[in-house]
Amino acid sequence: MDCFAETEGKRAHDPLYQRRAAAAATPATGVPVDDVDKVVDVPGAVIVGAGPAGVAVGALLGLRGVAYVVLERCGCIASLWRHRTYDRLCLHLPKRFCELPLRPFPASFPEYPTRDQFLGYLDAYAREFGVEPVFRRAVISAEYDGESWWVYTREVVAAAAGGEQAVLGCTMTVYRSRWLVVATGENAEPVVPEMDGAGRFKGQMMHSSEYRNGDGYAGKKVLVVGCGNSGMEVSLDLCNHNARASMVVRDTVHVLPREILGFSTFGLSMWLLRWLSVQTVDWLVLLLSFLVFGDTARLGIPRPSLGPFELKSVSGKTPVLDVGTLAKIKSGDIKVTPAIQCFQEHGVEFVDGSTEEFDVVILATGYKSNVPYWLKEKEFFSEKDGFPRKGNAWKGQNGLYAVGFSRRGLSGVSMDANNIVQDIVQRLHDMGYERSENN
């Protein structure tokens, strides 16, 4: 029996739907919408986002017999991984820390699976647990009316490309549910900062989400703006393709070896944190990093005053796990530059007064949450950055949940998903519903 009840039609005689459509849809999109075309009642949860987080929650809900629908604005699961990452990307942490609930990675996979291996794992995971998202469905607004969540969506008729916004259709479908799971994650939208004179630059400029590999960059002078994991790896990839790469370092950053003495730095640190304080583990990790790299400040990469794991706990700032970039910096194959003062027609002026010409600028300036743009709720999520106001929070009020916002990567996704599904099942039990679990 179909667990979703659909009510279709223009609803010309229903003022409730007319009022909601006019108030929520038109201002959010700027495109006139006559009214609601369809309302879908979901006797369970609406999950917004079909990345690893949304797929994991859907899989666990399905196993517990709880109805759900996953809404995804793109035409595939894990669209960030599939369409906005560089080809050489591998998981930065060992695979045991990146598994989704109930299914380990295949034993044949390397310790750090490639992007394509991870995507294959996600596709197989979704098939195994029967997670079938509603694709090309953009959520433009979601609000709680005192009883249910109303999630307003429009069909994506043309995907976003080249910095342009996606084109949305004119008909609206509303999903109404008791629970809303926000699974759009920390990296929903690229961050493109305002930079003085950027419009004057006549070379090529792109965000790192558009970069795939170094083919075609040989011999070109490329400036990578940003020194996080993406900036470091893009710079390394460019160097390996014989580009003349430079990397902007405008702030302090912790760079750690991905492995120490054959052990994962992250895994070793997590093991030590069972018995030692964060400050002690930071001291040990930084000592070992110094033995491997030397003083990174001499390379133009100063470290923060707080240790890497203490800094992560108080600010969410993730240390960089080096995969070979620092060796290229030491050899002079990758140049480190200070922050940009302003752009010129053919290059940039740096804050130290020096200037240099570049053919290409790649902005490895990160991503941001898009939750404030569509979720009409101000208590749980911050309007400033689109993250839960309390660190590691996964549960809000009125059946609102967040998965994948803990700044703990894929390991945090699994923890959040398990907590959310257990809470929903307990609420159903408290309401007197008994659902059979799938075997």
Curated annotation (Swiss-Prot):
Induction: Repressed by the transcription factor OSH1 during anther development. Reduction of auxin levels at late stage of anther development, after meiosis of microspore mother cells, is necessary for normal anther dehiscence and seed setting. The keyword Disulfide bond does not apply. Its EC number is 1.14.13.168. GO terms for biological process: anther dehiscence; auxin biosynthetic process. Gene3D superfamilies: FAD/NAD(P)-binding domain. It catalyses: indole-3-pyruvate + NADPH + O2 + H(+) = (indol-3-yl)acetate + CO2 + NADP(+) + H2O. Pfam families: FMO-like (PF00743). GO terms for molecular function: flavin adenine dinucleotide binding; indole-3-pyruvate monooxygenase activity; monooxygenase activity; N,N-dimethylaniline monooxygenase activity; NADP binding. Keywords: FAD, Flavoprotein, Monooxygenase, NADP, Oxidoreductase. Its cofactor is FAD. NADP(+) binds at residues 226-231. FAD binds at residues 49-54. Transmembrane segments: none annotated. InterPro entries: Auxin_biosynth/cation_transpt, FAD/NAD-bd_sf, Flavin_mOase-like. Plants overexpressing YUCCA4 are male sterile due to defect in anther dehiscence and mature pollen grain release at anthesis. Plants silencing YUCCA4 do not exhibit any visible phenotype. Belongs to the FMO family. Involved in auxin biosynthesis in anthers. This is Indole-3-pyruvate monooxygenase YUCCA4. The gene is YUCCA4.
